[in-house]
């Protein structure tokens, strides 16, 4: 009887719905990114965290590597810092996003390394080492303000201390951003290093790659996705505007999926991994074709248009303590470098995420 009760209790824990899933949704159609399942239960989250912690220890801190083609060339100590701007007013840095913001596999030299999140190397939120060997936004800001807080300190998962104010989650989609914003505000506000009302905060939002890569082809009405993206971004930005004083938001464009997954003559490992990482574009699981890829590409273009319009909308303009700037990061991205049509050293082992060099 005792064993039976324990089993029932454990099953009950796993079947509990997610604590943030009780909000009624106003969207006309409920698509796959709006749904919660048994996998969102509290028990499953605990199990997932345990599994990730186990993998973290197995893989090890790959972000500490100091040699490899995936790393940028170190800038010599006799080369002065090239910028001459006043950025010292920014005291807090944070970020929200998916595996690109988590710098998944940035220091990967093999398949297993892709399980590691090298957050200290992420271009928008990584603060490992310094700008000479890890040229990231936080490491540049630290030149002007050594007391900057919030940047990721090294390899970490979201629940690790070294993640700091990097709220990114692997597999995250647009639907997750409002929740991330609430969690981020709580984390920053509770940090004793932060002067909540006086410190200026820089937040980078980069999301959407998984929507276009893995979910758009599973939806009944995929053309509605940009409108949903608009509502979620508006909800997120309004929450930050109303709840976090002195905030500057970098809204980064959705990454260009086709420029990566449609590369020609990819290594076999990359081709194989792309079937899982971007199944709406690669393989036959969802009857991918040139026609379907063109359809997804148009939806991605709408994502980009929506993001630009939101950043430039009147409700986020002319405010004393809040601003949004659109960063068209992926629009002109190119893999050409060092005389190569595609320099794979800019990409991680899976040719999908960015290497440390690519982040720099």
Regions inferred by a protein language model and the residue ranges of each:
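Short, solvent-exposed loop/turn and secondary-structure capping segments
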Residues: 104-109, 177-178, 214-219, 261-264, ...
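Conserved SGNH/GDSL esterase-like catalytic core that processes O-acyl groups on lipids
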Residues: 110-232, 238
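Short, solvent-exposed beta-strand-terminating loops
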Residues: 97-108, 255-270, 329-334
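Substrate-gating cap/lid alpha-helix
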Residues: 228, 234, 260-325, 356-359
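Structural recognition of the beta-strand scaffold that forms the well-ordered cores
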Residues: 92-104, 139, 163-168, 201-206, ...
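Histidine-centered active-site loop/cap adjacent to the catalytic His
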Residues: 343-360
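Conserved beta-strand elements of beta-rich interaction domains across eukaryotes
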Residues: 16, 99-101, 170-172, 208-212, ...
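N-terminal secretory targeting modules
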Residues: 2-96, 100-157, 196-199
């Amino acid at each position: 009887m005792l064993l039976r009760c324990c089993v029932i209790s454990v099953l009950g824990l796993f079947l509990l719905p997610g604590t943030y899933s009780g909000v009624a949704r106003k969207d006309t159609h409920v698509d796959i990114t709006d749904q919660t399942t048994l996998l969102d239960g509290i028990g499953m989250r605990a199990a997932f965290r345990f599994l990730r912690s186990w993998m973290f220890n197995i893989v090890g801190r790959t972000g500490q590597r100091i040699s490899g083609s995936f790393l940028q060339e170190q800038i010599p100590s006799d080369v002065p810092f090239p910028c001459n701007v006043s950025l010292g007013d920014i005291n807090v840095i944070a970020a929200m996003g998916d595996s690109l913001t988590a710098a998944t596999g940035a220091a990967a030299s093999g398949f297993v390394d892709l399980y590691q999140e090298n957050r200290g190397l992420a271009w928008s939120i990584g603060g490992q080492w310094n700008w000479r060997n890890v040229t990231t936004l936080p490491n540049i800001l630290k030149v002007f303000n050594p007391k900057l807080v919030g940047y990721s300190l090294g390899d970490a998962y979201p629940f690790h201390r070294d993640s700091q104010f990097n709220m990114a989650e692997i597999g995250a989609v647009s639907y997750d951003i409002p929740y991330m914003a609430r969690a981020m505000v709580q984390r920053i506000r509770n940090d004793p290093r932060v002067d909540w009302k006086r410190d200026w905060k820089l937040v980078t939002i980069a999301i959407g790659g998984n929507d276009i890569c893995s979910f758009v082809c599973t939806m009944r009405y995929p053309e509605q996705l940009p409108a949903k993206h608009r509502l979620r971004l508006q909800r997120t930005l309004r929450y930050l505007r109303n709840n976090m004083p002195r905030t500057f938001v970098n809204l980064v464009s959705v990454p260009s999926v086709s420029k990566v997954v449609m590369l020609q003559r990819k290594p076999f490992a990359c081709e194989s991994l792309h079937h899982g990482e971007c199944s709406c574009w690669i393989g036959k699981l969802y009857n991918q074709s040139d026609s379907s890829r063109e359809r997804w590409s148009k939806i991605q273009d709408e994502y980009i248009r929506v993001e630009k319009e939101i950043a430039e909308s009147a409700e986020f303009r002319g405010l004393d303590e809040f601003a949004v700037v659109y960063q068209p990061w992926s629009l002109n991205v190119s893999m050409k470098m060092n005389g190569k049509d595609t320099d794979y050293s800019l990409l991680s082992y899976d040719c999908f995420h960015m290497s440390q060099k690519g982040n720099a």
